[in-house]
């Protein structure tokens, strides 16, 4: 007789089938290349009307701000500018404003649109008061707009930040800082709330990053779920990363794409996945990464996934990192696909 834990496990055959469905062995080069003095990061792609949009992060040497680009074919992108700026001086998010749309339709063969709640379209964002690249501590904010077309007019929630590493109920794995979120609607409420928020965070010992979860019924008030992370890798006492989760629903299986670093041999940062039937118990893929460093433009890192399927082709955008002659990082957004484009 199977135990309850064994029933939650995803079989090796199913894991292999998911890998074959989502793999993207063909690299198509840079989708958005950085200009001098900037680094680009963390793509989110969705459809509205007849156009595709990409929300991405721009680092200008001071901190993060959130930008937008558009495309008609998912390959050529035109920048539209900044849509979510840093907060006012003296505010908790005065130096960092890394936002991403929430409630994306997760269906693998779905329309890849944004779903509204309470008549609004939502974003989660990480914010911070200190200059620099992801300087601790970072906390979580919420913002909304009245329609996807209002991408330049987002209202910050007055009760921000909604999740902080200093919260009394923060768990050990999130005591240093909180990073990127992916929020999914769960009609079954299998985790205890209508909305489930997966996010990576760092502990205060080795700054090891793992992925945990929180739930909400209104997108504003969040309750942490569980005593620890749902995805973790590597030695708990050594720095490593399991980060930037995003989720799709492939038939009856939830698939979490995320990136790993410093726990899988000597390769640089890479993208992989895990699977679940209930959003709480996850089986990690132990095989070949979905993308990993292999080209001059991603020689250091190929990480931070955004994956979707459209017209039978799987598209996998990621942050590609290399270094120039003086050792400085070059960060842009690259694309890999399931078919040779």
Enumerate the language-model features and the residues they cover.
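Beta-rich carbohydrate-recognition and catalytic domains
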Residues: 1-99, 103-179, 184-240, 248-300, ...
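Acidic/His-leaning functional-site neighborhoods
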Residues: 304
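Conserved GNAT-family N-acetyltransferase fold
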Residues: 245
């Amino acid at each position: 007789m199977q135990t309850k834990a064994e029933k939650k496990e995803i079989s090796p055959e199913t894991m292999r089938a998911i890998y074959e469905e989502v793999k993207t062995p063909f690299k198509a080069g840079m989708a958005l290349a950085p200009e001098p003095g900037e680094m680009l990061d963390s793509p989110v792609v969705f459809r509205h009307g007849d156009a595709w949009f990409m929300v991405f992060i721009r680092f200008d040497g001071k901190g993060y701000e959130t930008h937008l680009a558009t495309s008609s074919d998912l390959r050529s992108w035109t920048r539209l500018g900044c849509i979510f700026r840093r907060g006012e001086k003296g505010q908790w998010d005065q130096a960092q404003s890394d936002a991403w749309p929430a409630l994306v339709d997760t269906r693998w063969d779905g329309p890849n649109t944004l779903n509204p709640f309470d008549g609004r379209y939502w974003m989660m964002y990480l914010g911070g008061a200190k200059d620099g690249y992801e300087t601790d501590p970072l906390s979580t904010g919420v913002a909304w707009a009245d329609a996807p077309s209002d991408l330049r007019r987002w209202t910050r929630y007055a009760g921000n930040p909604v999740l902080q590493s200093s919260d009394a109920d923060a768990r050990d794995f999130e005591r240093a800082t909180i990073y990127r979120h992916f929020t999914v609607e769960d009609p079954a409420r299998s985790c205890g709330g209508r909305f489930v928020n997966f996010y990576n965070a760092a502990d205060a010992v080795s700054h090891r990053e793992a992925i945990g979860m929180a739930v909400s019924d209104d997108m504003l008030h969040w309750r942490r779920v569980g005593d620890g992370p749902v995805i973790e890798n590597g030695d708990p006492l050594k720095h490593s990363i399991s980060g930037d989760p995003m989720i799709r629903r492939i038939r009856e299986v939830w698939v979490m794409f995320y990136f790993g670093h410093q726990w899988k041999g000597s390769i640089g940062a890479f993208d992989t996945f895990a699977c679940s039937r209930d959003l709480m118990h996850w089986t990690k893929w132990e095989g070949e990464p979905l993308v990993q460093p292999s080209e001059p433009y991603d020689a250091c890192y190929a990480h931070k996934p955004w994956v979707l399927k459209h017209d039978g082709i799987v598209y996998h955008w990621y942050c590609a990192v290399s270094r120039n002659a003086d050792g400085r990082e070059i960060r842009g957004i690259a694309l890999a696909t399931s078919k040779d484009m």
